[in-house]
Amino acid sequence: VHLNIVNGLLDGSAIYNGDFADPFALHVGATVYVYASDTTTAHIPVLAADPTTDFAGQYLGDAMPTLPSWTFPGYQWGPAVWARPDGTYVLYYATPDQAPSSACIADAQRAHVTAGLCYLAWSKESRQCLSRAVASSPTGPFVDDSTGPFICPRRQGGAIDPSVFVSADGTPYLVWKSDGNGYGLPTAIYSERLTSDGLAVAGPPHRLIGATQPWEGNLVEGPSMVEAGGAYWLFYSANDWDTPNYAIGVARCRTVDGPCQKPLDHPLLSTTNDPANDQGPGGQEFLDVGGFVWMVHHGWLPGQAGTPNGQRRLYVDLVAFDGPHGQPALAAGSLAAALADVIDGATVPGQPTNPPDAYLDEVHASASPYAKQSDRALLALGHSTCTSLGGSQTAAEGEKLVDGALRKGADPLGRAVPVAFAVQQLCPQYLPGLRQDLQSMLYH
């Protein structure tokens, strides 16, 4: 399967202007709910995003306003939510497996500090572990009635970053990270089958991958799994979370429980050389909207990685699984390179700047453009469309040409990608029409 990630299909900007790290997206009805790690105002912040308006996010509040008594606020990380068949929802999250003593908390409050000797001792003794909560609505309130975490490998440093995967037969699994890096221990990604209600484990954990490549540094984390093309694709984040070196990788697994192999020796999505782009992308999760796969992830604002007041913003990318190759690749990278050639006045290699109608018809008619045509050929299609737009007398006429280019043929995604890139880069005055047409095609 050839994996294409179209980074910033419409405008590449964040969909929520606030700190929103380790996102998880859940599609319910006409709304996409996105959850994140704790902030100063919420244990599990949640927002509602509308996929028909570029996933513009509206903050809703705290999905779990009350924590169980055995844990401690300020460390609720990497949430994931499963929509159960009975219409209820299960929230999985990482949280400390114990709280500091009441005396320690009182001392810290009197001294107006959040750390001290007792906190240092508590941080060494406690572990981040996984718990679960239930709600009747995706917005909560989620209630955790447990007496302790249900996944907690203390000897491995604990567990964080739960992600739900449901197999074709409806069996729920949780993939998660052993959190050893804070204790001088190795990290790894595991999968574990859950009971039918999702509230307990139903089998032993299976190790999927560890940190084995130079770009990963000393850790792998933030797992998420997608089934496509007869394989299970395990996406993960790696390297130091608070640096621009943080990036997203991928492994191909034979089953949910492995074995898994990494087909690349480099990240799938990483910090670019453009100082205007977000840095250190990670925390990726996936959702299906209208038959199209989208990836949500966070990224540091430029220059803010690891700074005291730095923010990780929320981004969404379009993903395509198609093609004859067994090795994933980024479509955005090759398209961007080809666009640079076009912008500089060069022709697209192997294709004329304005492909003839016969060639365009061949591309349009392809049932699977990603499998049958190269990225540069698709770009040529988009460039031709944009060139045609340049000769339009009015914006309305240009928008009609965009509409025609998108709707001709059987694969809207295969056309939307190059047309979107070309219009965005070469004739942005037609972006409003393009945006409207894409929304109409992808979501209605």
Please tell me what each predicted stretch does.
Residues 55, 200, 369, 394-395:
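A general structural signal for well-ordered secondary-structure junctions
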Residues 267-272, 279-281, 363-367, 382-384, ...:
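Short, local alpha-helical segments
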Residues 1-30, 346-394, 442-444:
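Extracytoplasmic low-complexity, Pro/Thr/Ser/Ala/Gly-rich segments
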Residues 1-348:
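Carbohydrate-active catalytic/glycan-binding domains of CAZyme proteins
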Residues 383-444:
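Extracytosolic low-complexity repeat regions of secreted or lipid-anchored proteins
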Residues 36, 67, 85, 93, ...:
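Sec/Tat-exported extracytoplasmic proteins
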Residues 17, 36-38, 73, 123-124, ...:
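Extracytoplasmic/periplasmic, Sec-exported soluble proteins
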Residues 27-30, 189, 288, 358, ...:
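Extracytoplasmic/secreted proteins, especially bacterial periplasmic and envelope-associated proteins
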